[in-house]
């Protein structure tokens, strides 16, 4: 039986084939043999000779076409590029563009998903986008419906509008309801953006404050270094000057005595003469000390105040115990000198807000002063003008408590708690000389270079040479006014000046530049003098009250008066360029390149922007609490490079940005 089964299987594979078929899947050797015969037959037809007529012609035609197509260069390049393509690229090339974009947007790496911040919002980003997009589509559809409705009403107003179908109304209602729901999403989006912007602004403000504090510290350190450098330079200059002069001074003491005797005899002769009693010819004796103007080396100017908003307070100091009569400073955050009716003249460091000393020598209150670099000029009610050199200052401790104990009161143990407002020092060695020629109080002064002009209640102006310390010219204001009146009578024209006010200073303000001098007096006239000839070159008529302040530049002259007005004059034409007024008399005024500031009998400083003509207030009175004590009236103002100083009636001095 076994032999018969082997004979039935010609290939002899039946001996190793299991009854269930090859590999247990039902595939027998007979199936494999049949598949092999079919493959052999097909290959024979395809690969057989072309001349064999037994093969089908369509096979040969197909192979010839394929062979011809493969020989083309374009086809060969495509085949070569296909062989260099990775399997991943082959798979991607079978995807459409839309499918690729969908996969790129829908599949994100885990690293990006892990960095998504947590959000407490109840809506998603897609909902917000959809709310914005739907609103745009709604507006377009609303415009289309509105235009169509207008056209129908225009064409058939007589027929009347038919009621819409319920279905259309429901659709409209659903659309409006959906849009109303989306409004909440959009409102939440706007609210979130506002909160985010507020947080960013708060962070920026904090960062700005930190940088401003850093800038303030740098400027304080810079001021200290420059002060130390200036002191060393001054000491070196003094040593170099005294070294060659020491033997000469020691060898000629007798000659000095002779010179001193000659000055004494000359003064005695002048006193014995009639002209010595005249206020026009009285000259002071030569000062033993000469004025040496040492320019302060300023390598960089302070810029801290430029980063504050206009009207911001920088510092406030209780400078005096009575009304401030005069203040001036050299540059922002530099040195300030203040005078008041408490008969003191104080020097301040504006960078730290501390009094560095006193200028003592006047016998009465100081009415006017000017600070230029390290030189200070003060004019007092004792009819004298004194010059001070702050670079020579040497501080000496003194008692300067404001609230001193009365005699008879015992000093308790808490004397250290007494309110001491100032640094208890006095400045010695900074006094240079005194200019004594006026016979009444000095109410105005101005110096530039080696020339100083002073105005007094004795109705004269005096020109001083600061190198020699002598008066070189006296200008009689009354004589000039009389000459103008005589000339006016001859030409049938009379100036419209008024009679001087008894309560006002006869010489209210003055300023000089080279040979030009502008002087404002109590008759409301502004006279322009030529110092070379000693004559009035021009008179500006317009004010109806005493002139209290003035200042000029290359083009304009600005004057303030007790008639409550400030006038801007064009010096080229001699006419009024602009004018404005306040509610009360003007007591002080100054301007820089951008603004004009004035004290007008109120607790604020009046500011006028020259560019746009805008008026605004600056000072402690702006936004002051009405229930509390009101700030004192501003009496004096000074302005340089946007840095404003105000002196009040209660002795307070404050610095502001302007």
Swiss-Prot record:
WD repeats lie at residues 319-360, 361-398, 437-476, 482-539, 542-581, 583-618, 629-658. InterPro entries: G-protein_beta_WD-40_rep, WD40/YVTN_repeat-like_dom_sf, WD40_repeat_CS, WD40_repeat_dom_sf, WD40_rpt. PROSITE patterns: WD_REPEATS_1, WD_REPEATS_2, WD_REPEATS_REGION. Residues 139-151 have a biased composition (Basic residues). It comes from the Eukaryota. Residues 138-170 are annotated as: Disordered. Its main location: mitochondrion. Residues 209-246 form a coiled coil. It is a peripheral membrane protein. One of its GO terms (cellular component) is mitochondrial outer membrane. It is found in: Mitochondrion outer membrane. Keywords: Coiled coil, Membrane, Mitochondrion, Mitochondrion outer membrane, Repeat, WD repeat. The keyword Coiled coil applies. Involved in mitochondrial fission. Acts as an adapter protein required to form mitochondrial fission complexes. Formation of these complexes is required to promote constriction and fission of the mitochondrial compartment at a late step in mitochondrial division. Belongs to the WD repeat MDV1/CAF4 family. This is Mitochondrial division protein 1. The lineage of its organism: Eukaryota, Fungi, Dikarya, Ascomycota, Pezizomycotina.
